[in-house]
Amino acid sequence: MQAIKCVVVGDGAVGKTCLLISYTTNAFPGEYIPTVFDNYSANVMVDGRPINLGLWDTAGQEDYDRLRPLSYPQTDVFLVCFALNNPASFENVRAKWYPEVSHHCPNTPIILVGTKADLREDRDTVERLRERRLQPVSQTQGYVMAKEIKAVKYLECSALTQRGLKQVFDEAIRAVLTPPQRAKKSKCTVL
């Protein structure tokens, strides 16, 4: 059985731990508790292949900036997360998370994940953002960011409703099992 290490990164409170708890237990945790999810191992089938999926949660808060990279060695795939209702967390994908993971693991595939998809249409959420002259991150913005950071895929999900949740992890596994073909560069040969 092939083992795959999947590390989840992103700003504090974007829903990384909820994503993992909801996926692994099929239940949404009640209140926000900064990262307490232990590394978790799940045996799953993707495209008829048995996979041992190791899930590593990380703390997004700045206090952990020096500690977090200790979980990066031997990572097979990163989930870089932001909350669709938090434009600042989206900007930090470009400003912080992509630079950090690409520095430590330059050839490791990235899946860009927009969390809290259920809040994009939530009236209270939209109103709170509007009061600050902001709006939820659009799907188009997500696709543009994914291209910019060379992510294998851009996906949106809700840990609360579980919409798109399984797909996030299935696509993370596929990114490792069937890496995208790199464009072949012609090599210069001097004779």
From Swiss-Prot:
This is Ras-related protein ced-10. Belongs to the small GTPase superfamily. Rho family. The keyword Nucleotide-binding applies. Signal peptide: none annotated. One of its GO terms (molecular function) is protein kinase binding. The lineage of its organism: Eukaryota, Metazoa, Ecdysozoa, Nematoda, Chromadorea. A lipid is attached at residue 188 (S-geranylgeranyl cysteine). A motif (Effector region) lies at residues 32-40. Coiled coil: none annotated. One of its GO terms (biological process) is actin filament organization. It comes from Caenorhabditis elegans. It is found in: Cell membrane.
